[in-house]
């Protein structure tokens, strides 16, 4: 397999890891099977490996995990593919739709899921403004997602809806 992109992923990428967090990784490869995807989990790690073409398809669909890997400052790239990776520009409306649905799905969950919903809102806001985002949260952003994730379900849903609408102002 020919590696194209490798990055830490999940809580270690977002800056939300704690002492018991597993180590998530995301790797994009070239291999014979264009449908290839592998997801392996054990006690200490969670690794995703995906064919380059399938990865590009996920980027174009606005899949959060693919966009986070694409925009990760921690990523190691095969330099031959770096210009192409940097040229990828998913459709903002597609990204907005995917992030909206995903954030609302997370909204009904526990603290960790609500934190992910708020993180997606921050990423969506930056993406809609700049066409790119940094999945690595700053300390103030970590405090922001943690504060809102502590709200009860009803208050959280109201706040999330408001932040989503703000992120998409001028689009919806």
For every predicted segment, state its role.
Residues 1-19, 32-172:
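The feature captures the alpha-helical scaffold/lid subdomain characteristic of nucleotidyltransferase
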């Amino acid at each position: 397999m020919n590696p194209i992109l490798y990055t830490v992923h999940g809580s270690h990428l977002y800056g939300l890891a704690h002492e018991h967090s597993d180590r998530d990784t995301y790797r994009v490869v070239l291999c014979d099977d264009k449908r290839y995807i592998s997801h392996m989990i054990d006690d200490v790690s969670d690794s995703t490996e995906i064919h380059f073409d399938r990865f590009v398809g996920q980027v174009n669909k606005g899949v959060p995990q693919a966009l986070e890997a694409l925009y990760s400052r921690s990523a190691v790239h095969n330099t031959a593919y770096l210009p192409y990776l940097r040229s990828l520009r998913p459709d903002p409306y597609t990204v907005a739709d995917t992030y909206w649905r995903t954030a609302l799905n997370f909204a009904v969950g526990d603290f960790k899921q609500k934190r992910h919903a708020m993180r997606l809102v921050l990423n969506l806001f930056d993406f809609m403004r700049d066409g790119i985002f940094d999945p690595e949260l700053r300390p103030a952003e970590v405090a922001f997602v943690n504060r809102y994730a502590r709200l009860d379900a009803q208050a959280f849903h109201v706040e999330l809806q408001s932040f989503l609408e703000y992120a998409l102002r001028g689009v919806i």
